[in-house]
């Protein structure tokens, strides 16, 4: 299942005539897996693709902190994180039997391109999609510098 293991590496992919993207085999996705397209935390023409269960787990952890923590700062941070997660989620989709995922018109509009070519990087439990190769290369450069 997508997200059960760390996803590393980068790849480029195109869309077929029905706006479907084929996920690489190392993402370990299966037919029927539900994923969520979210606005990226970097906010620069990028979309994050998370398994639905990861989003659900993050929200559950935030709820638990809100209910159990006695530290007001932690409660406020958990509320803000939950708000950010819920407001960034855009579209849910299913992965089909041939490992294809439909890229919704809203997602293509947010990525700001009419192109059918996307640049992707796997990061732990998500895939980050870029439509702009320069932004992708810039992000990869910054990612390696951070480590």
Language-model region placement:
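Flexible "stalk/tail and boundary" regions
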Residues: 1-13, 17-18, 26-98, 105-147
């Amino acid at each position: 299942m997508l997200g059960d293991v760390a996803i590393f590496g980068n790849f480029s992919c195109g869309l077929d005539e029905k706006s479907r993207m084929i996920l690489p085999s190392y993402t370990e996705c299966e037919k029927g897996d539900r994923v969520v397209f979210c606005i990226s935390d970097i906010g620069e023409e990028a979309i994050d693709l998370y398994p639905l269960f990861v989003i659900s787990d993050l929200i559950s952890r935030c709820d638990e902190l809100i209910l159990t923590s006695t530290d007001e700062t932690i409660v406020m941070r958990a509320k803000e994180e939950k708000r950010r997660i819920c407001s960034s989620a855009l579209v849910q989709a299913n992965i089909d039997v041939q490992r294809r995922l439909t890229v919704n018109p809203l997602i293509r509009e947010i990525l700001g391109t009419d192109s059918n070519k996307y640049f992707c990087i796997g990061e732990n439990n998500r895939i980050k999609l870029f439509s702009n190769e320069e932004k992708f290369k810039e992000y990869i450069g910054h990612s390696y510098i951070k480590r």
